[in-house]
Regions:
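Surface-exposed loop/edge segments in extracytoplasmic proteins
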Residues: 174-176
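Amphipathic alpha-helical segments that form well-ordered structural scaffolds
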Residues: 56-60, 164-168, 190
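Surface-exposed patches in mature extracellular/periplasmic domains of secreted proteins
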Residues: 67-75, 119-126, 178-179
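Extracellular LysM carbohydrate-binding repeats and other cell-envelope/extracellular binding modules
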Residues: 187-201
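Catalytic cores and adjacent binding grooves of peptidoglycan-active enzymes
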Residues: 4-8, 85-95, 99-172, 181, ...
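Active-site acidic/histidine clusters and adjacent loop/turn architecture
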Residues: 1-68
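Active-site-adjacent loop/helix surface patches within enzyme catalytic domains
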Residues: 56-90
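Short, surface-exposed alpha-helical recognition segments that flank or form part
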Residues: 45-49, 157, 178
Length: 201
């Protein structure tokens, strides 16, 4: 059973789905084109998250492609690793698909994802020789000169990037009291504790 947070940027709210079965369709996904198990991929976490916009981008891609898209990896928690330090997989908005398919099929999936214009980034096929990567990153990266970083999280923010922050703080032993995607007082206290520990204040 999984607990799923879905950030709705249109309403700036976090929706919560408790006790989802692995074969249940992902909330906001088109029909039964993406199951919780497929979205989870190799993650062993019980708590997962994504955004309505990522699901909308998935739906547009799936409709344009017109057939099933095998999902190898989507969600990962930051402490599970397997991706770069600012991976959009940790935000629940990235998909690595098409593993085990032919080059021609991957080219069709890539073309469909690109044509939707719904993804923030569709990785060039030259960088992903045996899969297709696309993600629906959002916000402005905190570091200038890049499009791949995470946005700044501030007190009062509510989104999946706050969930990453809370997850990382909890993994380091600085408890945020909860994992809810809301940057409140306990998250701020935990963050300041880490900043002091590493001399970042």
């Amino acid at each position: 059973m999984a607990k799923l947070y879905v950030y709705d940027s249109y309403e700036n709210r976090m929706l919560v789905y408790n006790n989802l079965n692995e074969n249940d369709p992902m909330p906001y996904s088109y029909g039964s084109t993406l199951s919780v198990r497929e979205f989870r991929g190799s993650s062993n976490a019980r708590v997962l998250w994504t955004t309505t916009r990522a699901m909308e981008a998935w739906n547009l891609t799936r409709r344009r492609y017109g057939a099933g898209i095998p999902v190898g990896y989507a969600f990962k928690r930051i402490w599970e690793g397997g991706h770069g330090t600012a991976s959009q997989h940790y935000a629940g908005v990235a998909f690595d698909v098409g593993q085990g398919t032919s080059r021609a099929i991957r080219q069709r999936i890539h073309a469909a994802a690109t044509a939707t214009r719904a993804w923030g980034y569709v990785e060039p096929l030259s960088m992903t020789p045996t899969w297709v990567h696309f993600d629906r990153r959002y916000g402005t990266p905190a570091c200038s000169g890049t499009t791949s970083g995470y946005p700044t999280c501030r007190r009062g923010d509510k989104n999946t990037y706050v969930l990453i922050l809370q997850d990382a703080l909890n993994a380091l032993g600085y408890t945020t009291g909860t994992l809810d995607g809301v940057f409140g007082a306990r998250t701020e206290t935990a963050l300041k504790g880490v900043q002091r520990r590493f001399g970042l204040t």
